UniProtKB/Swiss-Prot annotation:
Keywords, ordered alphabetically: Iron, Metal-binding, Oxygen transport, Transport
CDD domains named among the record's database cross-references: Hemerythrin-like
Protein name: Hemerythrin-like protein
Binding-site list for Fe cation 2: E88, H109, H113, H142, D147
InterPro entries (UniProt xref): Haemerythrin, Hemerythrin, Hemerythrin-like, Hemerythrin-like_sf
Pfam families: Hemerythrin
Protein function: Oxygen-binding protein. The oxygen-binding site contains two iron atoms.
GO molecular function: iron ion binding; oxygen carrier activity
Sequence similarity: Belongs to the hemerythrin family.
Residues annotated for Fe cation 1 binding in this entry: H54, H84, E88, D147
Lineage, opening ranks: Eukaryota, Metazoa, Cnidaria, Anthozoa, Hexacorallia
Length: 156
């Protein structure tokens, strides 16, 4: 399956570009992340509810991998992503309304969420290595770049 490149909705400022995930030619294409096996402190956005949800997203992707072909695991992952995106977007909207977060970033962030949900849904129940690796790379890239942009800018 030809998967699309992992896209960013805006230029990522250098402080948010994680050197282990990006090569010198791109802001958005992560290097292979097979060395990552779980959420760790380097993924903290410093909002407890969002950090907890991010941990859970790692868990559901690994669960899909462990239970290949299990429709329940895929459905649980899709629900976890959708639920997290709903929570995160609501928190971000408050930041936009308070003037702490840029509206263009918010819109781009929501677009990235929607594109991922659409793509994940298109995978069906039998995710192979490519789809699972893509999902994990997308998650890592999204947290380390796109989500890091809102640190300190949300109203809870």
């Amino acid at each position: 399956m030809g998967l699309p490149p992992i896209e960013c909705p805006f230029d990522i400022p250098k402080p948010f570009r994680h050197p282990d995930l990006f090569d010198k030619f791109s802001n958005c294409d992560p290097l292979p992340i097979f060395f990552l096996n779980r959420w760790n402190e380097s993924f903290k956005v410093f909002y407890q509810n969002l950090d907890d949800e991010h941990r859970g997203l790692f868990d559901v992707v690994f669960d899909v991998d462990a239970k290949r072909g299990d429709a329940g695991a895929v459905s649980k992952a899709a629900s976890a992503f959708k639920g997290h995106f709903t929570t995160e977007e609501a928190e971000m909207k408050k930041g936009v309304d308070a003037g702490k977060l840029d509206g263009a970033h918010y819109k781009g962030h929501c677009t990235a969420h929607n594109k991922f949900l659409e793509l994940f849904g298109s995978f069906g129940n039998n995710l192979g290595d490519d789809e699972i690796n893509y999902s994990m790379k997308w998650l890592v890239n999204h947290i380390k770049s796109t989500d890091f942009h809102y640190k300190g800018k949300l109203i809870q």
